[in-house]
C-alpha cells in the first residue's frame, strides 16, 4: 500500500493499513516484535556509543596514536557515532511506540544518519585500501602517506557520503519508513512521481556502492600479489613486513565485516528495486536493515582486538594512567614500537 510519503508491504484489502507517521503498525507483526526491536536498538546504543567514543577519546589523548592511518580509523568511529546518536535513538523511540512517532522530520533524520554512517564507513575502507596499496605495493616511488594525505582522504569520504545522503533531503528520491515502519531508508520501493527514485537508486548503487567496492578489491588484489613477491624476494626486513601484514590484516577484516553487515541489506534493496510489485513481508527488509546497523560496533572492536598499541593506551586511560598488564604486554609493545619505526605507517 503506497501513501503520499510511505510504502507499507501489505495489500490494504481489509482497510486496516494506516500511516506509519500517525498510527501503531501492530497489524504488520506481533507487538512483541516491536519490543524486541527496541531492546536490540538499546543494546546497540549502550555498546556502540561507549566503544566508539572511547576509540575517539583514547586516540586524541595519546599523541603516539595520532598517525595518518589512524585519522581514517577515527573517521570510522565518528561515522559510527553519527549512526548511534542520530539514527539508533530515533529508531528505538519509534519501536517503543510501534510507529514513526517523530513524523517525517524524524524519518529524514534517522534515514540520513544511518545512510551517512554507512557511506562514510565504505568510503573510509576504500581510502584505507588505497593507502595499503600505495604503502605496500609502492606504485609511486618514495611516497609516504602523511598527514595531508590523511586529511584529504577523510575529506573525500565526507564529500562522497554527503553526495549520496543529501539529495533525498532536497527532492531527488526521499527517505521513507521501511520494514516494520520504525526505521527509514532510501525509497527503493516506489516510482513516486516527482522524486526520480529510479535514477537516484542507480546512481547510489553504481557510484556509492560498486565503485568503492571495485577500488577495495583492486587494491587488495594487487596488495596480496605484492606481499607474496616481497616475501619470496625478501626485499624488506622481517620486522617491516610483519608490521605491514598486521595493518593489512586488520583492514581486510574490517572490509569483510562491512560486507557481512551491509551486503544483505544492499542485496535485498536491489531486489525490491528491480522487482517492484512483488509480494514480501515487513520482516523481509527489517532483518537485513537492523543487521546492517550492527556495523557500528564491529569496527572499534576489531581495532581494539587487533591493535596492541591502542589496547595498551586504552587500558592506561581506563586505569587512570597506569597499565596493570604492562608486564605481560611489554614484549609485544617493544616489537610493535620497533615495527612502527620501520614502517611508513603505525602498525595495528
Swiss-Prot record:
Q: Which residues lie on this side of the membrane: Extracellular?
A: 1-33, 94-107, 171-199, 272-283
Q: At which positions is motif 'Ionic lock' involved in activated form stabilization? A: 131-133
Q: What is its main location?
A: membrane
Q: How is it modified after translation?
A: Phosphorylated on some or all of the serine and threonine residues present in the C-terminal region.
Q: Where is the composition biased (Low complexity)?
A: 332-348
How is this protein positioned relative to the membrane? Multi-pass membrane protein
Among the Pfam families in the record, one is 7tm_1
- Per the record, where is site Plays an important role in the conformation switch to the active conformation? 110
**Spans annotated as Disordered:** 327-348
Q: Which SUPFAM superfamilies match?
A: Family A G protein-coupled receptor-like
What CDD domains is this protein classified in?
A: 7tmA_MWS_opsin
Its job: Photoreceptor required for image-forming vision at low light intensity. While most salt water fish species use retinal as chromophore, most freshwater fish use 3-dehydroretinal, or a mixture of retinal and 3-dehydroretinal. Light-induced isomerization of 11-cis to all-trans retinal triggers a conformational change that activates signaling via G-proteins. Subsequent receptor phosphorylation mediates displacement of the bound G-protein alpha subunit by arrestin and terminates signaling.
Question: What's the protein here called?
Answer: Rhodopsin
**Organism in which the protein naturally occurs:** Sargocentron punctatissimum
Instruction: Recite the lineage of the species.
Output: Eukaryota, Metazoa, Chordata, Craniata, Vertebrata
Q: Which gene encodes it?
A: rho
